[in-house]
């Protein structure tokens, strides 16, 4: 059985020769279709072809069937094709069949089409029945269509046929051991190159003209070129050999070179998505888009990076990845000069300068600059949280939120400050931290004049003036100014402690508490008192310490009027009036007002004495007992009251005579 491929394009180079293929052994990296061969000029003449070829072209008198535009493969040849090539083959065959049906050709549905529609590999021939690739005789156009339909049918099928040939020409390569076939193919390339060169030269000569040239064929008028001299012989329809963008969209006026591109474009206006994925039900405008989508379900990644070996499921993703190695950023913003690897990233960035927010939420009316942001925001209304942590089961609405959360478990901090070396788990935290070094404070409070380096901090601060507490606990009704405080409070009800120390395994309800705790292991004390030089691991500890120097006691008991430096001390003091003892020992049932007192009491049962004197080696259950021991036995003092003012000093060891002399001088 012979397989015939008919390919032509009325607006392209001179018509192409019809090839038949008789099968031969196929090398592993070759395919079967030859390149197009010029046979007809625009006016239907046979151009500058050898006489032997013209004789061959006059012998075929067959009518067109689907087999004339079909290509079959053997099992061996089919295995040589990649995943993408197989789907491209299916796309072309189905589109060929659809176009022939739309033109009214009377023939039953071929078995090949039935197999393709059922997603079954196409039927193939045995390799024994296939001999060699040879150049066959072209079919006469007079016998292909009835006389009254020849012009319109031939024009349309050829226009579509060229688009299909362009697809296959990139997919399939010529393979032939026949010297005659190879010679004809070489002649084809030479003629086509000469044709393109001559056209470019003639268009360059006629470039000074500006009048629009049109070609009238029947009822249709199509623009051919806008840069031809109206007096030139090339302005005549039958002498113009190349047409630019013949196919125009009736809705928006956009022009296309190929009829198939116009059909795909029209689906944008209609919103039609005829190609549906059988796995997930997602619809696509083109079969090629569906084919690329199916790779997601199969997990296949046919496109590999030659430098690092990383695989991708699309060629575009591979191209974007390659720019990572080269560092190339060809797309530059005209406003700020920032460069990007892809044009899509540049377009997204430019929305920052324009302030445009084209994506609007239908539920609440909030607008966003990026479609991805709108998608994540929409999950607030739907309650959808598709991204779940495998370690703790917590779910998130965005993949980036899950990535940040996972770093809590792994302890990863990829963002490091170049000035002080401090690392952060989020890039936004690093950006905020850098303002400490630059001392930038762009955001000022209009009520008290206090400046802030971060806008979010100013927003939180202004709630102090308004006394707004918008975040309310659903369990007890307690209200908070900040959402993070409410979340931390809710964990007191649930008992959840999601933040774990990697060094000792201790867990915390609040991330801030974990950060301060980790400084115990690292010895880091970033907050230093400017008056006495004492350093602290937490900012709140420094704030409380400063009140020793200032004598400030802002936290006052409403019952007895006693004032305290710290709010936690006031809470503990209030329990004296209420008699509350919330901390109970599970061993003996004894209750305590303070959690630290319970911890010290538990060591009575366990016998643990973690506080050891460096001088004599004596150990104690509570740190206060060790402090008293040092004062009594070793004269180690931590604080002194001189001249009626209380000053904080670092612990020092002094002799008995030194203490007496200090007190005497006072």
UniProtKB/Swiss-Prot annotation:
This is Zinc finger protein 311. Pfam families: KRAB, zf-C2H2, zf-C2H2_6. One of its GO terms (biological process) is regulation of transcription by RNA polymerase II. A zinc finger (C2H2-type) spans 247-269, 275-297, 303-325, 331-353, 359-381, 387-409, 415-437, 443-465, 471-493, 499-521, 527-549, 555-577, 583-605, 611-634. Keywords: DNA-binding, Metal-binding, Nucleus, Repeat, Transcription, Transcription regulation, Zinc, Zinc-finger. Belongs to the krueppel C2H2-type zinc-finger protein family. The gene is ZNF311. The keyword Disulfide bond does not apply. PANTHER family: IP01015P-RELATED (PTHR24377). It comes from Homo sapiens. Residues 64-135 form the KRAB domain. One of its GO terms (cellular component) is nucleus. SUPFAM superfamilies: beta-beta-alpha zinc fingers (SSF57667), KRAB domain (Kruppel-associated box) (SSF109640). One of its GO terms (molecular function) is DNA-binding transcription factor activity, RNA polymerase II-specific. It is found in: Nucleus. May be involved in transcriptional regulation.
């Amino acid at each position: 059985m012979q397989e015939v491929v008919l390919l032509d394009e009325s607006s392209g180079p001179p018509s192409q020769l019809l090839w038949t293929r008789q099968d031969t052994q196929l090398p592993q990296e070759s395919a079967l279709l030859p390149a197009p061969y010029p046979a007809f000029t625009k006016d239907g003449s046979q151009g500058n072809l050898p006489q032997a070829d013209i004789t061959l072209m006059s012998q075929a008198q067959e009518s067109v069937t689907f087999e004339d535009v079909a290509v079959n493969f053997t099992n061996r040849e089919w295995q040589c094709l990649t995943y993408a090539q197989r789907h491209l083959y299916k796309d072309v065959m189905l589109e060929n069949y659809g176009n022939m049906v739309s033109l009214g050709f009377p023939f039953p549905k071929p078995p090949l089409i039935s197999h393709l529609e059922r997603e079954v590999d196409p039927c193939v021939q045995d390799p024994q029945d296939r001999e060699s690739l040879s150049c066959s005789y072209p079919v006469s156009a007079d016998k292909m269509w009835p006389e009254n339909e020849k012009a319109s049918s031939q024009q349309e099928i050829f226009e579509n046929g060229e688009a299909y040939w362009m697809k296959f020409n990139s997919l399939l390569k010529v393979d032939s051991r026949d010297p005659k076939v190879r010679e004809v193919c070489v002649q084809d390339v030479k003629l086509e190159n000469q044709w393109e060169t001559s056209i470019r030269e003639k268009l360059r000569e006629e470039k000074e003209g500006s009048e629009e040239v049109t070609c009238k064929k029947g009822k249709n008028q199509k623009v051919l070129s806008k840069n031809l001299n109206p007096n030139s012989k090339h302005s005549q329809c039958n002498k113009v050999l190349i047409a630019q963008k013949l196919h125009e969209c009736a809705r928006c006026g956009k022009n296309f070179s190929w009829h198939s591109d116009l059909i795909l474009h029209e689906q944008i206006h209609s919103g039609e998505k005829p190609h549906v994925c059988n796995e997930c039900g997602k619809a696509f405008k083109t079969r090629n888009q569906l084919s690329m989508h199916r790779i997601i379900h199969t997990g296949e990644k046919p496109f590999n990076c030659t430098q690092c070996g990383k695989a991708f499921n699309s060629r575009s993703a591979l191209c974007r990845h390659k720019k990572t190695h080269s560092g190339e950023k060809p797309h530059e913003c005209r406003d700020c000069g920032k460069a990007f690897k892809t044009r899509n990233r540049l377009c997204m960035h430019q929305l920052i300068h324009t302030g445009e927010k084209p994506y609007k939420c239908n539920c609440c009316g909030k607008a966003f600059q990026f479609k991805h942001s709108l998608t994540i925001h929409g999950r607030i209304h739907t309650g959808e949280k598709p991204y779940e942590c495998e370690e703790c089961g917590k779910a998130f609405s965005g993949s980036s939120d899950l990535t940040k959360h996972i770093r809590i478990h792994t302890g990863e901090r990829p963002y490091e400050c170049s000035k002080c070396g401090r690392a952060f788990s989020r890039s936004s935290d690093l950006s905020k931290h850098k303002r400490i070094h630059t001392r930038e404070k762009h955001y000022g409070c209009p009520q008290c004049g206090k400046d802030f380096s971060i806008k979010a901090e100013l927003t939180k601060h202004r709630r102090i003036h308004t006394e707004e507490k918008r975040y309310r606990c659903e369990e007890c009704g307690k209200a908070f100014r900040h959402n993070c405080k409410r979340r931390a409070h809710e964990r007191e009800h649930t008992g959840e402690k999601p933040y774990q120390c990697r060094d000792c395994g201790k867990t915390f309800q609040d991330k801030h508490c974990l950060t301060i705790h980790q400084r115990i292991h690292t010895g880091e004390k970033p907050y230093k008192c400017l008056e006495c030089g004492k350093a602290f691991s937490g900012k709140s500890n420094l704030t409380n310490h400063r009140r020793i120097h200032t004598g400030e006691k802002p936290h006052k008991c409403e019952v007895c009027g006693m004032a305290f430096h710290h709010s936690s001390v006031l809470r503990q003091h209030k329990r004296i009036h209420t008699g509350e003892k919330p901390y109970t020992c599970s061993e003996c049932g004894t209750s305590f007002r303070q959690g630290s007192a319970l911890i010290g009491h538990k060591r009575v049962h366990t016998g643990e004495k973690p506080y050891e004197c460096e001088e004599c080696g004596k150990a104690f259950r509570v740190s206060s007992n060790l402090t008293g021991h040092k004062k009594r036995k070793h004269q180690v003092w931590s604080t002194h009251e001189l001249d009626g003012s209380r000053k904080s000093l670092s612990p020092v060891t002094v002799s008995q005579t030194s203490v007496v002399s200090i007190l005497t001088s006072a």
